[in-house]
Amino acid sequence: MANKVAQEISTLIEPLINAQQLLLWDVSYTKEGGQKVLRILIDKRNHEFITMDDITTFTQAVNELLDTIEPDPIPEAYMLDISSPGADRPLIRPWHYEWAKASGENILVAFFVAKNGQKKWQGKIETIDDKGITLTTSSETIVCTFDEIAKAVLDTQF
């Protein structure tokens, strides 16, 4: 939630998230192809699968909430996109890494600068602290800070 609108929306929808037993993965407000997009990524708590009915119910509640708030937190035209973060969900915040570790799945990590000769690694999170993670790969252990990670996603194998 890199901006003020996303932070405000996150705060506004928190009661809806809690009432519907959901997990707020991320909120972003960006410009895409000339159009403003408010994107809200939600999931079920406890590693359960979210359904389209869950997303539809939440979307209706968010629409009703945003239509009644004065002053309007987003006075310009925008598209509302509410969805699951997906199986290959982005790992953005430190708690996302905790979630990924608990899932037992591998993650894919791309670094800004190569680690041990490679910019991309796949493995399981062994440890997490407030500064970074320890990633166990098939061949070695990589220790890194969150600041060194360019992008990380869950690597769910079906």
Curated annotation (Swiss-Prot):
Keywords: Cytoplasm, Ribosome biogenesis. Disulfide bonds: none annotated. InterPro entries: Ribosome_maturation_RimP (IPR003728), RimP_C (IPR028998), RimP_C_sf (IPR036847), RimP_N (IPR028989), RimP_N_sf (IPR035956). It comes from the Bacteria. The keyword Cytoplasm applies. It is found in: Cytoplasm. The keyword Thylakoid does not apply. Gene3D superfamilies: Ribosome maturation factor RimP, C-terminal domain, RimP-like superfamily, N-terminal. Its main location: cytoplasm. Pfam families: DUF150_C, RimP_N. GO terms for cellular component: cytosol. One of its GO terms (biological process) is translation. Required for maturation of 30S ribosomal subunits. Belongs to the RimP family. This is Ribosome maturation factor RimP. The gene is rimP.
